[in-house]
């Protein structure tokens, strides 16, 4: 098992690899009760009004207890994020987009408690962002002739959350709205006006310094 995990991690790009390791470590620590599972649950009020900032960090890596289901979820997520990370020419832009998504998510959680951890929500939004940018190249073909966009699957899951689990619109919007905002800033505005609004602060500063 250890050898399999090490081999899988070796094929994952740096940022996604660090996140995957963090998820595995936190999952193990909570299962062993070294970290209290109750203290990894994110709450805007507890973090920003009570000063329990550890919950914010824990929630980014929280994928549940150490079991086969959480392991599969972590490595499926790592596979998606590896594809996205490898599509960026600059790793710092990938990191900056993750930060922007996190800021938007945290702002949304100030209005309503999220249904999932910040790590799960970040993954959902990054997948949405990838589907919006490269969706036409990722179509799934059924019966050898019918092309189906993979974006239909998030729509289905969001519908299940609303009609079956009775989640609020804002809870559901946390799964895709931050990703849509970043996609609009990065792709649509960039194509129309030729401005890259998602450049990292380092790139903005470097461009202003360049004569």
Swiss-Prot record:
Q: How does a null allele present? A: Impaired degradation of proteins with misfolded lumenal domains such as CPY*, a mutant, misfolded form of carboxypeptidase Y which is a known ERAD-L substrate. Degradation of proteins with misfolded intramembrane domains is not affected.
Record note on modification: N-terminally acetylated by acetyltransferase NatB which enhances DER1 stability and is required for ERAD-L function.
Q: Name one GO biological process term.
A: protein quality control for misfolded or incompletely synthesized proteins
Q: What induces it?
A: Up-regulated by the unfolded protein response (UPR).
Q: Which GO terms describe its molecular function?
A: misfolded protein binding; signal recognition particle binding
N-acetylmethionine found at: 1
Q: Name one GO cellular component term.
A: Hrd1p ubiquitin ligase complex
Record topology, Lumenal segments:
33-67, 110-117, 166-168
Disulfides per UniProt: none
Q: State the membrane topology.
A: Multi-pass membrane protein
Give the UniProt keywords, A-Z.
Acetylation, Endoplasmic reticulum, Membrane, Protein transport, Transmembrane, Transmembrane helix, Transport
Q: Where in the cell is it found?
A: Endoplasmic reticulum membrane
Which ranges does the record list as Cytoplasmic topological domains? Answer: 1-14, 86-92, 134-149, 190-211
Q: Where are the transmembrane segments?
A: 15-32, 68-85, 93-109, 118-133, 150-165, 169-189
PANTHER family on file: DER1-LIKE PROTEIN, DERLIN
- Further remark: Present with 238 molecules/cell in log phase SD medium.
Family, as annotated: Belongs to the derlin family.
Give the quaternary structure: Component of the HRD1 ubiquitin ligase complex which contains the E3 ligase HRD1, its cofactors HRD3, USA1 and DER1, substrate recruiting factor YOS9 and CDC48-binding protein UBX2. Within the complex, interacts with USA1 (via C-terminus). In ERAD-L, HRD3 and YOS9 jointly bind misfolded glycoproteins in the endoplasmic reticulum (ER) lumen. Movement of ERAD-L substrates through the ER membrane is facilitated by HRD1 and DER1 which have lateral gates facing each other and which distort the membrane region between the lateral gates, making it much thinner than a normal phospholipid bilayer.
Function (record text): Component of the endoplasmic reticulum-associated degradation (ERAD) pathway. Specifically required for the ERAD-L pathway which mediates the degradation of proteins with misfolded lumenal domains within the endoplasmic reticulum (ER). Facilitates retrotranslocation of misfolded proteins from the ER lumen through the ER membrane in conjunction with HRD1. Both proteins have lateral gates facing each other and distort the membrane region between the lateral gates, making it much thinner than a normal phospholipid bilayer.
Descriptive protein name = Degradation in the endoplasmic reticulum protein 1
> What is the source species?
Saccharomyces cerevisiae (strain ATCC 204508 / S288c)
